[in-house]
């Protein structure tokens, strides 16, 4: 039983109450009494509104299901369907024109373009690594990944391979020639870098000296001007450093003593309380809030063991240079942090209201993550986050403008409880639900003075696409979904609406995740598509990926690209509403088996770690042993696709069960080296994780909007209770 403290009409889990009063509040200037009194009023007033919004979701879904059921066997009538969506209030009239009014936004969001990390804040080591991923070694990112081929004797091996190292150096020099070209000659032929009279001087191997073609790209240096340790350059708004140390192992092999190129990489990071974590009770939530507190106070630390040595990882300090004019120049040493709260769906028993009901988790997150952020606003920190006095909160999984307006209201109420100026709390709107996509302009308008981010999350969005049209017929295979008409229109619409509502210079327009952290050569080739599509940020799965994705923002001037895109014909809502139905379902038995096995394996690989180990985001080997980043969004697609095929008779429940059992053996094998792993086979009936995976598919049509959280949370609590955790 959870030990509770009565606070007014609230029953608060003691572990949360003690954390808030003893750790979160001291140093904020907020009194415990006023906080809890204010929190209770917010909960009493807004929890019923939250509940009503969820009821509306269910009502609209029931009406859409009924419409499709009444037309079973008939060809889809797109015009009648659109008229029906308008009639039931799903598709609203377009909002009148407006411009976002957000103020006090940091440059990393408003005026720069670069990669964005998303990490589970429940994991302190991941959180620290991401915070410190503002700057990343290009040499390490190239040497350690498949960007540099192993052909011609360039294998990674255990020790340093000079053949491979030389390929890395050549790649980096080519980057320097592209991003910071010399007035004459090439960085390839540089023999030294020095600073004279406030300018960068580059000596070449032919004995001549030259400078930068654009002298203004040189900003600053570290060390002695005649023999600097680092030279700071800027291109397309992003910084990078040529690091020089002729005595270092790499510098010794370089004619100019260059040991590395340090890239400004993850400009921003989302510290995630949502899809990448497994938090089901007060104990779990306190782990999340405590790590967020450490980030906001600048004192988060973690013991890390590497290569037999143990050290303490902390948040990096700012970077200090001597500017070209001789004055001191300081650059932010860390990624600018957002915090992603949970959406409106789930409740959590960390707090019970005056009626004994669990309180919506999104309201709890809003109160506690904002309270904690005050430490960073008022200077009670050694590591400043926002320099403009803002708190950046990503709000996921909102359905339509009423829900965005509810978030705006919640944030206003939280500001009042905490004594913060209006619109201190900024909002990032995830465009990952169909009703938000088709009403995106109105959603932004509902939070127009807070909005700092819109982002397409195509994974969740695909899950909602399938569930919304569950009764319309069988959908295409998962791999074919990306080439369906709706998805291109959805991606373009996000950029079109963002630019039309004045987000440029005030907010990020973002794109989704590269989900294959080991396939960096493919990412380098393909992910340039995101800045070319007008996104001034896009998600990456690791600090290394952030360093490499930064190269794309040197190749593409995103803000110039946005100016071009603003002139195109906006995406069509009719295209967005095109349901991804399979034109026919005469797949071969082998094709069906492969699709079912692939999805079943992904579901099990993710769910078993979620339920048994409380891991909400992990690199899960797929059926071909390719590591894929999985979180609840990928689980939502896989489970909904199988539920859809089951609903329309493409597959039987027996096929699902048989595939899950076979794939459980595969997943067990893939996890055999993990000493804490509990095999699912052969005791399937008594294995909580296996039963959770099965339930997600066979009961998939009944899950609210296809979300996986209700099943996962219930089953994780069952596992914890069963094992005394």
Swiss-Prot record:
Pathway: Carbohydrate metabolism; glyoxylate cycle; (S)-malate from isocitrate: step 2/2. SUPFAM superfamilies: Malate synthase G (SSF51645). It is found in: Cytoplasm. Mg(2+) binds at residues 432, 460. Acetyl-CoA binds at residues 118, 125-126, 276, 313, 541. Its cofactor is Mg(2+). InterPro entries: Malate_synth_C_sf, Malate_synth_sf, Malate_synthase_TIM, Malate_synthG, MS_C, MS_N, MS_N_TIM-barrel_dom, MSG_insertion. The modification Cysteine sulfenic acid (-SOH) is found at residue 617. GO terms for biological process: glyoxylate catabolic process; glyoxylate cycle; tricarboxylic acid cycle. GO terms for molecular function: magnesium ion binding; malate synthase activity. It comes from Pseudomonas paraeruginosa (strain DSM 24068 / PA7). The active site is at residues 340, 631. It catalyses: glyoxylate + acetyl-CoA + H2O = (S)-malate + CoA + H(+). It comes from the Bacteria. Its EC number is 2.3.3.9. One of its GO terms (cellular component) is cytosol. Involved in the glycolate utilization. Catalyzes the condensation and subsequent hydrolysis of acetyl-coenzyme A (acetyl-CoA) and glyoxylate to form malate and CoA. This is Malate synthase G.
């Amino acid at each position: 039983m959870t030990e509770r403290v009565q606070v007014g009409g609230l029953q608060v889990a003691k572990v949360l109450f003690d954390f808030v009063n003893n750790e979160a509040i001291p140093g904020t200037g907020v009194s415990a009494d006023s906080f809890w009194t204010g929190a209770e009023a917010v909960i009493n007033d807004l929890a019923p509104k939250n509940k009503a919004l969820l009821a509306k979701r269910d009502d609209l879904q029931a009406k859409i299901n009924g419409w499709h059921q009444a037309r079973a066997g008939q060809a889809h009538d797109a015009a009648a369907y659109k008229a029906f969506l308008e009639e039931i209030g799903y598709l609203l009239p377009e909002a009148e024109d407006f411009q976002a009014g957000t103020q006090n936004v940091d440059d990393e969001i408003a005026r720069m373009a670069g990669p964005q990390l998303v990490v589970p804040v429940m994991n302190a080591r991941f959180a620290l690594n991401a915070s410190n991923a503002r700057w990343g070694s290009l040499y390490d990112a190239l040497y350690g990944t498949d960007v540099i081929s192993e052909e011609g004797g360039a294998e990674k091996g255990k020790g340093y391979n000079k053949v491979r190292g030389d390929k890395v150096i050549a790649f980096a020099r080519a980057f320097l020639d592209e991003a910071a070209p010399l007035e004459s000659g090439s960085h390839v032929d540089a023999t030294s870098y020095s600073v004279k009279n406030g300018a960068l001087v580059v000596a070449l191997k032919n004995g001549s000296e030259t400078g930068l073609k654009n002298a203004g790209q040189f900003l600053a240096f570290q060390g002695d001007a005649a023999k600097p340790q680092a030279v700071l350059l800027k291109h397309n708004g992003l910084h990078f450093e040529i690091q020089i140390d002729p005595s270092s192992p790499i510098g010794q092999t370089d004619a100019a003593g260059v040991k590395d190129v340090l890239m400004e990489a993850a400009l921003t990071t989302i510290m995630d309380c949502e899809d990448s974590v497994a938090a089901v009770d007060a104990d779990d939530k306190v782990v999340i809030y405590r790590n967020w507190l450490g980030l906001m106070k600048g004192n988060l630390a973690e013991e890390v063991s590497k290569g037999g040595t143990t050290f303490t990882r902390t948040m990096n300090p700012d970077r200090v240079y001597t500017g070209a004019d001789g004055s001191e120049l300081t650059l932010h040493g860390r990624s600018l942090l957002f915090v992603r709260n949970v959406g409106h769906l789930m409740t959590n028993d960390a707090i019970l209201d005056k009626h004994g009901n669990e309180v919506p988790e999104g309201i709890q997150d809003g109160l506690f993550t904002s309270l904690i952020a005050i430490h960073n606003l008022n200077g009670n920190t050694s590591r400043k986050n926002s320099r403009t006095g803002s708190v950046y909160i990503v709000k996921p999984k909102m359905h339509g403008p009423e829900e965005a307006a509810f978030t705006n209201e919640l944030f206003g109420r939280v500001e009042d409880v905490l004594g913060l100026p209006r619109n201190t709390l900024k909002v990032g709107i995830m465009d990952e639900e169909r009703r938000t996509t088709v009403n995106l302009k109105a959603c932004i308008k509902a939070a127009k003075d807070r909005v700092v981010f819109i982002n397409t999350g195509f994974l969740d969005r695909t899950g909602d696409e399938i569930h919304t049209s569950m009764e319309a017929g069988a959908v295409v295979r998962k791999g074919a979904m990306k080439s369906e008409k709706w998805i291109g229109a959805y991606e373009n619409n996000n950029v079109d609406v963002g630019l039309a509502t004045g987000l440029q210079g005030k907010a990020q327009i973002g794109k989704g995740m590269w989900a294959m952290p080991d396939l960096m050569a493919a990412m380098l080739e393909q992910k340039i598509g995101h800045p070319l599509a007008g996104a001034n940020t896009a998600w990456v799965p690791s600090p290394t990926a952030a360093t490499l994705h930064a190269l794309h923002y040197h190749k593409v001037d995103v803000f110039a690209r946005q100016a071009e895109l603003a002139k195109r014909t906006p995406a069509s809502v009719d295209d967005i509403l095109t349901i991804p139905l399979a034109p026919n379902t005469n797949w071969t038995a082998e094709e069906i088996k492969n699709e079912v096995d692939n999805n079943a394996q992904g579901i099990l690989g993710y769910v078993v770690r979620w339920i048994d180990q409380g891991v909400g985001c992990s690199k899960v080997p797929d059926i071909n042993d390719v590591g894929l980043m999985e979180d609840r969004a990928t689980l939502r697609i896989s489970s909904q696709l199988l539920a859809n095929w089951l609903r329309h008779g493409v597959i039987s429940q027996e096929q699902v069960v048989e595939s899950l059992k076979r794939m459980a053996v595969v997943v067990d094998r893939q996890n055999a080296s993990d000493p804490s792993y509990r095999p699912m086979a052969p005791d399937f009936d008594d294995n909580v994780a296996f039963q959770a995976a099965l339930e997600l598919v066979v009961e998939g049509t009944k899950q609210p909007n296809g979300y996986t959280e209700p099943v996962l949370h219930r089953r994780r609590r069952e596992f914890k209770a069963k094992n005394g955790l």
